[in-house]
């Protein structure tokens, strides 16, 4: 809020201010539920009456409400008196990028003057870690945690879970000008597709990712020569990194080898629903500062991942437009194109 110049309020009519948030499951009280479960076991069965009684005696009255995934957006609306559109996006790893894309559309069509948009997720708990382990999605380099996340490297074996939240302020241009806002960039294009394949795997030929990138380029009115940097989804899993590289090559053809690509998940881990919004902010800083973030732990090239992944060290380079990809479990694909704002 401070960076957006909104510390003293949002300078927008409450009914013209909205929230669009990408998130996962809501607040989960695993410890209380586990204690209740253990105390309710009789022989090999769960005594439902005992479980219910213990719940009524020990759980917070808002337990059911707070575990709903739309609660973060609801809390933000109350905090900022945002009486405009209030929406929540539940598309796994693509959620916060999709929230930003859809919030942009709300502003474009005049439904709001200001949208607070981004994502939040907290998955570092027993259920989250166990679940991703069952999917064999996590790295097993427990003896080398700092080197475990290695997108596009030949020896990658899964991602490292991260946690966090990231938000941006999306604002109608004349509204932003009127209050003298500092504009960090603009959303030029937005693409959203589905693989319609397996919920745990991206399509092996990059069908959805390819069409998503093309859709974002078309929405922005840009061609393959107009992108200066790609902030990849880059999860450090065997399939994702290969397929994303393939999709980039299908869209950009020979120019794919000249566009710097990196995955900041190599440094931050995978924030799941919050990943895309975090990477949007990284992309905007790359545009502002002319510094492209690296892919760390890139040591052994993979023949199927043969692009310029900005290995191991940031690179100074002029940057006008960025493609940021987010691909989620379930087959959701989101591509955003961000650009430097040129005030005519």
Q: Where are the regions that the model predicts?
A:
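Condensing-enzyme catalytic core mediating Claisen C-C bond formation in acyl metabolism
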Residues: 143-220, 228-229, 343-344
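A glycine- and small-aliphatic-rich helix-loop capping segment at beta-alpha/alpha-beta transitions
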Residues: 28-45, 107-109, 129-142, 204-205, ...
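Conserved small-residue
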Residues: 1, 19, 76, 96, ...
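Acyl-CoA/ACP chain-elongation machinery
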Residues: 111-157, 190-204, 232-241, 258-308
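Phosphate/pyrophosphate-binding loops at sites that engage ATP/ADP/AMP, CoA/4′-phosphopantetheine
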Residues: 1-14, 176-180, 213-229, 251-255
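Active-site nucleophile and cofactor-binding loops and adjacent substrate-binding regions
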Residues: 12-14, 63-70, 87-95, 263-275, ...
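Conserved beta-ketoacyl condensing-enzyme motif
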Residues: 1-80, 84-90, 120-129, 224-240
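Active-site-proximal alpha-helical scaffold in enzymes
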Residues: 1-7, 69-80, 86-121, 160-181, ...
